[in-house]
Structures are given as structure tokens and as C-alpha cells.
Amino acid sequence: MRIVSSLDEQFRLLHGRSVALLGAVPADRLYWQPRPLTGLYPAHSCGEHILRSAAAVEQTFGGINSNLWDDPFEWTLPEQLPTPSHVENYLAEAEQTRARSFGLFRSDSDLLKEIAVPSGDPRPLLDLVLETLTRAAHHQGRAFATFRLFSEARLPGL
């Protein structure tokens, strides 16, 4: 189970970094926009990227757990999660959903099993898990970059 354990660790680290970053962001800067949301290339806030990272995890592992591939977009809007404590609760929910999936993996070979996804084409679990880790880390990186636009603070343990 070396691959499963390694992936589990990477997702736990991802979650820990998001929680640490959230703790470093002043509440009044959580949804601060680096520039107006006009044009083709919106610049999202630190909080929005933290949420998008967790939402990627929730959507994939919610799909694996219960075959519900709902996009968490509507319940991860800033209006729905207006404070850092609301966001932290959502991060914990997404992490619990992910951990539940990893608890079902009994061996590395489980990651080779295929699962039906919304597109209709079956995909190996390993592909979905790696794609999700990449997408979630991408949004987390963007959250860190946005944080750097308004803060010089050193993030603890990062």
C-alpha cells in the first residue's frame, strides 16, 4: 500500500497547508480581489482559491464514495462561507470525505480499478486521484500567490 499511503500523505499535507494559510489570512482579506472581476481573466481571491482546492477534493471523493459527482460550486460561494471559520469547517468536511475514500482502499491495486465518471467513460481511480491532487494543488498555489499580494508574512511550517 505504498502508493495509497503516499497519496494519502500528500492529500493530508495539502489539507494542512490550506488550514495554515487560512489561519494566516486576515478575515478582511479572505475575499479581497486583486483587481476587479471584469474581462476574460478574472483574478480570484485567496479564499476563493482555498475553496476551489477543497472543492476539487470534495467533488472527486464524493463521487468515489457515493457516485454523486455534484459540483460543490453553489455551496462554496463566498456568500455561503463568509468567514474563516465557515471556510475551515468546509475544509474539514472535504478532508473527511477524502479520508473516507482512502479508508476503502485495501491495496495499491485498488487504484487500478475503473469507476464511471459523469462523462460516461470509465477511468482508473489512480488517474482521478492524481488529477484531483494536481488541480487542488494548483488552486492552493494560486491562493498562496494571492496571499503574497497583500502580505509579507511568513507562513508557519510552509
Across the structure, where does each feature detected by a protein language model lie?
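Amphipathic alpha-helical packing segments from all-alpha helical-bundle domains
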Residues: 18-21, 94
